[in-house]
Amino acid sequence: MKLAPINIKNKRATFDYELIDTYTAGIVLTGTEIKSIRLGKASLVDTFCYFAKGELWVKNMHIAEYFYGSYNNHAARRDRKLLLSKKELNKLERGTKDAGFTIVPVRLFINERGLAKVVVALAKGKKQYDKREALKEKDDRRDMDRMFKR
């Protein structure tokens, strides 16, 4: 039995931030966490990344408790370590310290080998008027599509 592909997205990330550069990172999970992700029970809303002791961690990622788990079940919103190469970690850390960027998880997926991966992006926060402008363009595009369908 093959499960449907898991592709959990952070829709707010593209609206609130201008994504500069993306990286695919592995994530350290427990057994019940990966089972919940395979069932699609995860959320990236209000999730962000931070550095601690030279390692990249993701905070506020919600992975629901596994329904069939016992007393060994995981905490839903614990901090989880991300796995990147040293070169990528240095580049991300430099970007956050020097340029004032932030690191935002954009997507959580399971690759062809069955491993959970997180796509993180070096991002710059958008101003309120940029967000309004993006919404206006989206509405205009939608109206144009409606006009051409008729």
UniProtKB/Swiss-Prot annotation:
- Keyword terms of this UniProt record: Cytoplasm, RNA-binding
Task: Kindly give the Pfam families that the UniProt entry links to this protein.
Answer: SmpB (PF01668)
Entry GO MF terms = RNA binding
Q: Which CDD domains match?
A: SmpB (cd09294)
UniProt GO cellular component terms: cytosol
User: Which compartments is it annotated to reside in?
Assistant: Cytoplasm
Q: Which PROSITE patterns match?
A: SSRP (PS01317)
A biological process (GO) of this protein is: trans-translation
Query: Is this entry keyworded Metal-binding?
Result: no
On whether Disulfide bond is a keyword of this UniProt record, the answer is: no
Q: Which SUPFAM superfamilies does the entry mention?
A: Small protein B (SmpB)
Q: Which InterPro entries match?
A: SmpB, SsrA-bd_prot, SsrA-bd_prot_CS
Q: Mark the transmembrane ranges.
A: none
User: What family is it from?
Assistant: Belongs to the SmpB family.
Q: What is the annotated role of this protein in its UniProt record?
A: Required for rescue of stalled ribosomes mediated by trans-translation. Binds to transfer-messenger RNA (tmRNA), required for stable association of tmRNA with ribosomes. tmRNA and SmpB together mimic tRNA shape, replacing the anticodon stem-loop with SmpB. tmRNA is encoded by the ssrA gene; the 2 termini fold to resemble tRNA(Ala) and it encodes a 'tag peptide', a short internal open reading frame. During trans-translation Ala-aminoacylated tmRNA acts like a tRNA, entering the A-site of stalled ribosomes, displacing the stalled mRNA.
This protein's name: SsrA-binding protein
